[in-house]
Amino acid sequence: QGKTVILENDLDLHSIDFTPIPTFSGTFQGNGHTISGLTLTGSGNVRGLFRYIQTGATVQDLTVMGTIHPNGHQDDLGLLAGSNAGRILNCIASGTVMGDNRIGGLVGINETGGELVGCAFSGSVTGKHSTAGVVGENRGTLTRCSNSGSINTHDLEDDPKTDYTNLAQLNSMENVPAYTDVGGVAGYSKGTIQSCSN
């Protein structure tokens, strides 16, 4: 708490068994650098580079690239953070995130008071409920954020049992996953979204 971390070089995590930073309540200055090769496949909820970004914390000017696809529990997932209650400024995430509930390209859940400004995602996100490119569930504020990634296309494209060329024979009970609250920027929001694009 109250500490400032300054990233002075790009970081490559491809050969590292990385454990998410449990909680962060200081200032993280990315200085435009990239953390690549983030891979999280172990069991557990609330996953990302950071598990929890706390109230009063700031993460800025950082790019994160990687893959998150945990075993077992798969809720609150995002490449940058599983949960954000602080400020995320001018950050970019690129890669693949797969899970169940509150799945976002950048952040799984943006808590009340949490803020994302000038952030962007590219890649693919797959989830069941509250799924989107920037934030899975938004209770805070999203400003000037953008998504250019694909959302929930994996199951539709890769399921050999699904024949979308014959809609008359489509059995939605069998072939279409029961996804809810899926969007481009935010899957579900009871917060504020302004000047965002998808």
Where are the language model's segments positioned?
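Surface-exposed repetitive/solenoidal architectures
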Residues: 1-198
